[in-house]
């Protein structure tokens, strides 16, 4: 199975002190053990770094620890880069649905899922994706 991980899964999976770690970690572990083929949007890499270095948990990962976590992640997760056309598609999609603001970042992650032709977009925030397109609704899953 090909799974694209949303940052809402990666953050708790990577940080043992996160309250949802036990829920999310098994999916990342399966990817690390090559039981699934895992993908991440390159946008999500920056988002994960930003979030885990500001998490209100103890111990909070330092920037160096966050870098190490992401470097390790990229040894077993495929990063999906977007091109100009992918960004244009995401913007067009948002405009056609009359959706403002930060939802564009979900649209970019959705574009990465479609580009990688995954079977599953794994997220803790399914409504952020199911509202974008019918084909995403069928791909979007929660743990």
Predicted features and spans:
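General structural signal for alpha-helix termini and helix-helix connectors
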Residues: 30-34, 54-58, 72-79, 96
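Active-site neighborhoods of divalent-metal-dependent phosphate/nucleic-acid chemistry enzymes
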Residues: 78-124
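Short, well-structured N-terminal submotif of metal-dependent ribonuclease cores
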Residues: 1-40, 55-65, 131
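Short beta-strand segments at enzyme active-site cores
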Residues: 39-42, 123
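Acidic, PIN/NYN-like endoribonuclease modules and their adjacent C-terminal/linker elements
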Residues: 2, 107-143
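Alpha-helix/helix-capping structural signal
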Residues: 8-9, 43, 108, 127
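Short acidic, glycine/proline-enriched helix-loop-strand junctions
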Residues: 62, 71-87, 98, 129-143
């Amino acid at each position: 199975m090909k799974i694209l991980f949303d940052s809402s899964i990666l953050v708790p999976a990577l940080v043992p002190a996160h309250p949802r770690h036990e829920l999310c970690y098994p999916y990342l572990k399966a990817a690390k053990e090559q039981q699934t083929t895992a993908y991440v949007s390159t946008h999500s890499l920056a988002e994960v770094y930003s979030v885990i270095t500001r998490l209100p948990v103890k111990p909070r990962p330092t920037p160096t620890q966050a870098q190490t976590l992401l470097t390790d992640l990229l040894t077993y997760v495929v990063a999906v880069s977007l091109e100009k056309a992918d960004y244009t598609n995401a913007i067009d999609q948002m405009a056609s649905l009359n959706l403002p603001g930060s939802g564009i970042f979900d649209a970019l992650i959705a574009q990465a899922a479609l580009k990688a032709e995954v079977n599953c977009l794994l997220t803790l925030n399914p409504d952020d994706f199911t509202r974008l397109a019918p084909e995403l609704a069928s791909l979007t899953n929660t743990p």
